[in-house]
């Protein structure tokens, strides 16, 4: 029903009528990527493409979260069911109703979890730190409401490491690198 509803949400009304891009509040990534997606600096209503794109991005996010948390384990059907709330929770379903903003909100979530894909326990993780800085900046420049996702995933991974009885020093190094990368990315 969301794809077929063809109803403009609050922010969509002005964009449909005037075609402006101004996502505001420092959302430069959203402004620039919207030029690529819409093929012009003047936005036109290309829904339901934007909603479908947001759904696809959230599906990718769900798979990446499973890969991050399960590491090398095989993904089973109950893991997929457990990951469904990532893209289908009631709080994010509202975001799909924004015809113009939905893909950039989903991208912000992708930017928030992407650094963990590059975290490897066996190396020095310079790539993890650099990608954390870049992805945190991109998250903040696309949709700042996703700012709490990175710290929460950091906590989940640290608790998982603790539960797996890993060395406390490794856990602290992971947390410190995550905090440093996150803070630098926000600055």
Predicted regions located by residue number:
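Membrane-interface micro-motifs in multi-pass membrane enzymes
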Residues: 23, 27, 54, 77-120, ...
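Juxtamembrane "helix-exit" motif on the non-cytosolic side of transmembrane helices
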Residues: 2-10, 37-40, 88-98, 162
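Short hydrophobic/aromatic helix or loop-helix immediately within or flanking a transmembrane segment
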Residues: 21-52
């Amino acid at each position: 029903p969301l794809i077929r509803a063809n109803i403009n949400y609050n922010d969509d009304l002005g964009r449909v009528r005037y075609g402006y891009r101004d996502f505001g509040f420092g959302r430069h990534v959203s402004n620039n990527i919207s030029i690529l997606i819409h093929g012009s600096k003047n936005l036109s209503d290309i829904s339901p493409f934007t909603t479908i794109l947001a759904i696809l991005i959230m599906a990718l996010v769900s798979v990446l979260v499973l890969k991050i948390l399960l590491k090398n384990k095989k993904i089973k059907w109950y893991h997929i069911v457990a990951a469904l709330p990532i893209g289908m929770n009631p709080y994010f379903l509202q975001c799909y109703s924004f015809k113009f903003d939905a893909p950039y909100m989903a991208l912000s979530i992708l930017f928030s979890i992407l650094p963990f894909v590059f975290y490897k326990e066996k190396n020095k993780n310079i790539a993890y730190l650099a990608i954390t800085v870049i992805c945190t900046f991109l998250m903040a420049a696309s949709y700042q409401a996703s700012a709490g996702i990175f710290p929460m995933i950091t906590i989940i991974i640290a608790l998982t490491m603790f539960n797996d009885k890993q060395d406390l020093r490794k856990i602290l190094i992971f947390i410190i690198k995550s905090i440093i990368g996150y803070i630098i990315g926000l600055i």
